[in-house]
A protein has these predicted regions:
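Conserved catalytic cysteine-centered active-site region
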Residues: 1-4, 37-79, 107-170, 179, ...
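Conserved small-residue
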Residues: 10, 28, 81, 100, ...
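Short, well-ordered amphipathic alpha-helical segments that serve as non-catalytic structural scaffolds
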Residues: 77-86, 140, 167, 239-240, ...
């Protein structure tokens, strides 16, 4: 039986670089940092006083009455999905053939913390009746599904910082296995709050460059000292190829395969051997019926942690072999910060734009490239990609040892 092909027909985003895809992409190619000092009072009570907040507040894009009943992560999901759906041409589709798979690594944590404060300071009568649907990890997916009346299934993978990529992979399988014709997929996160930031700081996971926030996220730099927490979301409309052609849809590229693995090593540390990452790359290429020689670009997970960046780079070098020499590697968290469960989704949006423009975005803030990093990093300015048929990888990893690799192919 001929396998159903899956293509990307719509994109949406709200990020530290912009409130839509076009603005975000322009900022990325310009090497702009979305990291800024925090102005909230609580920021002065924790060791790290900066983060990558969204560039455009939801209050500038949504009605106040809608915002009041939604967690910030749900707001990001609706903003990005509305842009993506419009970009896809607002397709007419049988609702029973329309699905939603949108992930979050943490869910409505800011709602939980804010409502707990209200309970403690003002009493139970003032706790919002919207609290439970606002804090549910599946809230973003559920709200998007309700707005679009999706009936093929609404799902929320939760695999820490691999969640967004896993959501796209799940959506890919829904279409490939004939459970849906269109699936709205991606990931969101809104965790810039005192407790999550204090917790990550306690793990020594965050950069502490309070005096220079814009240069704090520095994947692959010899003096990197941790990641920068970001927020926002990315959404992709995935569609069965013949369905998209029949309605005359704009087609960005094809999702050709995915690879999943787990490390079985540690709850929070990467396996220094990189064996799990290598397996995920191998599985993804096999699923896509491609070889390492077909890959010209990779958007790395590269969060700017001392251990993680090198472990990933070594694993990629081992997985790609000598072909790694012609793979342009971008570490876009240097500009957006780390969106946790939204990272793999927004970075998939970036790969789709890279495929469209044939331009790999830069990695900024590398003063001294760590000599232990042996992949070809795109530094400081964008790099043109080859003409003709090309393929690219997006890899995402999460606490717990989750590894996800997605394969994108020109069409």
């Amino acid at each position: 039986m001929t396998r159903r092909r899956v293509v990307v027909t719509g994109l949406g985003a709200t990020t530290p670089l912009g409130g839509d895809v076009a603005t975000t992409w322009a900022g990325l190619l310009a090497g702009k940092s979305g990291v800024r000092s925090l102005t909230e009072d609580w920021a002065q009570t924790i060791p790290v006083t900066f983060a990558a907040r969204v560039a455009v507040e939801p209050s500038e894009q949504m009605e106040r009455v809608e915002i009041r009943r939604l967690d910030r992560s749900e707001q990001f999901g609706l903003i990005a999905s509305r842009e993506a759906w419009k970009d896809a041409g607002s397709p007419e589709v049988d609702k029973e053939r329309l699905g939603v798979v949108v992930a979050s690594g943490i869910g409505g944590v800011t709602t939980l913390l804010d409502q707990y404060d209200i309970l403690n300071t003002k009493g139970s009568r003032l706790v919002s009746p919207h609290t439970v649907p606002m804090l549910m990890p599946n809230g973003p997916a559920a709200n998007i599904g309700l707005e679009l009346q999706a009936q093929a299934g609404v799902h929320t993978p939760v695999s820490a910082c691999a969640s967004g990529a896993e959501a796209i992979g799940y959506a890919f399988d829904m279409i490939r296995n004939n459970r849906a014709d269109i699936v709205v997929s991606g990931g969101v996160e809104a965790a810039c709050h005192a407790l999550p930031m204090a917790a990550f700081a306690a793990m020594k996971a965050l950069s502490t460059r309070n005096d220079d926030p814009a240069r704090a996220s520095r994947p692959y730099d010899l003096n990197r000292d941790g990641f920068v927490l970001g927020e926002g979301g990315g959404i992709l409309v995935l569609e069965e190829y013949e369905h998209a052609k029949a309605r005359g849809a704009k087609i960005y590229c094809e999702i050709a395969g995915q690879g999943l693995s787990s490390d079985g090593y540690h709850i929070a540390a990467p396996d220094p051997s990189g064996a799990g990452v290598q397996r995920a790359v191998k599985f993804a290429l096999k699923d896509a019926d491609l070889t390492t020689a077909d890959i010209v670009h990779l958007n790395a997970h590269a969060t700017s942690t001392p251990a993680g960046d090198v472990a990933e780079a070594n694993a990629l070098r081992a997985a790609l072999g000598n072909d790694a020499d012609h793979v342009a590697v971008s570490a876009t968290k240097s500009m957006t910060g780390h969106l946790l469960g939204g990272a793999g989704a927004i970075e998939s949006v970036f790969i789709v734009k890279t495929m469209q423009d044939r331009m790999a975005p830069p990695t900024i803030n590398i003063d001294d490239l760590d000599p232990a990093v042996t992949v070809d990093v795109v530094r400081d300015k964008p790099r043109a990609l080859p003409v003709g048929d090309i393929a690219a990888l997006n890899d995402s990893f999460g606490f717990g040892g989750h590894n996800v690799v997605l394969v994108f192919k020109s069409i």
